[in-house]
């Protein structure tokens, strides 16, 4: 169909051997791009704990995948700081470590305001990150679902957007706000 696809691969609940076997199966199937992520803590755990024989971090996973020479590797990036990061500078430096380990580009967590992405892009450039940073987009199917996901990811919900969705939901027009928000960002 002419679409580029990227398989997701995480460090969660797998040994290094199992993870690299999955990557090898992807390569054999013709997959050339991987989104390499640490992954979220398994349900019921407050924090991520690596498998005893697994990759301890996304940096380790990226380095191992890069060593195979078989993939373009994309990694996650957080314009509003990963919830586990000490601060935004440390988070940008962690992204730099992933790029230096062999990632070819980054895809951001979603955000609601373009300035959030632009500030992040500039902070990355200031740290010497030159790899492409692709803005992440979240199609809003349910405003309640989007707010829950934003809370999990540390994504700030602008008050004016929240008010627009809350008002529209009461009036049965939630979909029209999604479209209007999209159109507003297309013209910025």
Language model feature labels by segment:
Residues 180-187:
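Conserved small/polar residues in nucleotide/adenosyl-binding loops
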Residues 13-25:
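Glycine-rich anion/phosphate-binding loops
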């Amino acid at each position: 169909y002419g679409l580029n696809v990227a398989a997701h691969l995480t460090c969660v609940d797998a040994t290094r051997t199992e993870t690299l076997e999955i990557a090898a199966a992807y390569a054999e199937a013709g997959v050339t791009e991987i989104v390499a992520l640490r992954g979220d803590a398994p349900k019921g755990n407050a924090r991520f704990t690596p498998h005893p024989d697994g990759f301890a971090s996304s940096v380790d996973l990226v380095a191992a995948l890069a060593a195979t020479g078989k993939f373009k590797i994309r990694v996650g990036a957080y314009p509003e700081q990963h919830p586990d990061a000490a601060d935004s500078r440390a988070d940008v430096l962690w992204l730099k470590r992933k790029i230096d380990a062999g990632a070819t580009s980054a895809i951001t967590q979603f955000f609601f305001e373009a300035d959030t992405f632009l500030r992040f892009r500039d902070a990355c450039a200031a740290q010497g990150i030159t790899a492409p940073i692709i803005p992440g987009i979240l199609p809003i199917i349910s405003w309640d679902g989007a707010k829950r996901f934003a809370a999990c990811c540390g994504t700030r919900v602008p008050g004016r957007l929240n008010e627009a969705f809350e008002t529209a939901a009461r009036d049965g027009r939630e979909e029209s706000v999604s479209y209007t928000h999209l159109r507003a960002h297309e013209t910025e």
